[in-house]
A protein has these predicted regions:
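Central regulatory/effector-binding core of bacterial HTH transcription factors
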Residues: 2-65
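Hydrophobic residues within well-ordered alpha-helices
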Residues: 95, 141-145, 160
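Short beta-strand-to-loop elements that line the ligand-binding cleft
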Residues: 34-38, 123-134, 172
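Ligand-binding cleft/hinge of the Venus flytrap
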Residues: 7, 25, 111-125, 157
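Flexible hinge/capping segments at coil-to-helix
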Residues: 63-74, 78-103, 118
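Paired acidic/hydrophobic, glycine-rich loop segments that form the ligand-binding mouth/hinge
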Residues: 52-55, 147-151
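C-terminal effector-binding regulatory domain of bacterial HTH transcription factors
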Residues: 31, 153-164, 172-206
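Ligand-binding "clamshell"
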Residues: 61-66, 159-169
Length: 206
């Protein structure tokens, strides 16, 4: 098996989870070349000639084919040092009193976090003194005790398991953050199918 695979993943998850698996896959298949494009935005698979995307959440484009890789959810969390100095929120509205570490919309310095409250969807506007378009930067700021983040639990599962980050608002449902392997239509390349199978086997939820 030989040839290229062009793929995309979110920046933080791509660095911490996907890149090491690429190393393992290429040890098994040294004639394959993998190009990994990291972006927290949505990449057009057809326009950018991408074979495979790892994406979170439900898919809006029905023309894309998706395979569920991991079930995930978004969580609100902060370091124990932050919670020691700031009362943990009991309701999403309480986030207005917290320094929220924001992954902004283009041209904005705030973000909107979504919850389900008493069966109704609720969107809460949050803001803080640190803004970044890189999930890894936001994660590190949270670990350093600078504020509260909302992240896919899959991206920070090691930090949650170790207690380096502690969740809040767990009784409020957040949006779907399942991880999917997405392709533009049917996958014709054997190497892409083999790589997706490899990821499905090795991206194991803790």
């Amino acid at each position: 098996m030989r040839g290229p695979i062009r793929m995309t993943a979110t920046q933080d998850f791509g660095r911490t989870e996907v890149a090491p698996l690429i190393d393992r896959f290429l040890d098994l298949h040294p004639a394959v070349q993998i190009a990994l494009h990291l972006s927290d935005g949505v990449v057009d698979l057809v326009e950018q000639d991408i074979d495979l995307a790892l994406r979170n959440g439900p898919l809006a484009d029905s023309a894309l084919k998706a395979r569920l890789m991991l079930r995930g959810r978004r969580v609100v969390c902060a370091a124990p040092s932050y919670w020691a100095n700031h009362a943990a929120p009991n309701h999403p509205d309480d986030l207005a009193a917290h320094n929220c570490l924001v992954h902004p919309r283009p041209g904005s310095t705030f973000s909107s976090w979504s919850f389900t409250v008493e069966g109704r969807p609720v969107t809460v506007r949050v803001a803080g003194n640190r803004v970044a378009n890189d999930g890894g930067v936001l994660r590190q700021w949270a670990l350093d005790g600078h504020g509260v983040i909302m992240r896919n639990a899959l991206d920070i599962r090691k930090e949650l398991a170790s207690g380096a980050l502690v969740t809040a608002l767990d009784t409020f449902v957040t949006s779907n953050a399942n991880l999917y392997a997405v392709t533009a239509g049917s996958v014709s390349s054997q190497r892409v199918r083999t790589f997706i199978d490899f990821l499905a086997k090795n991206l194991v939820a803790d």
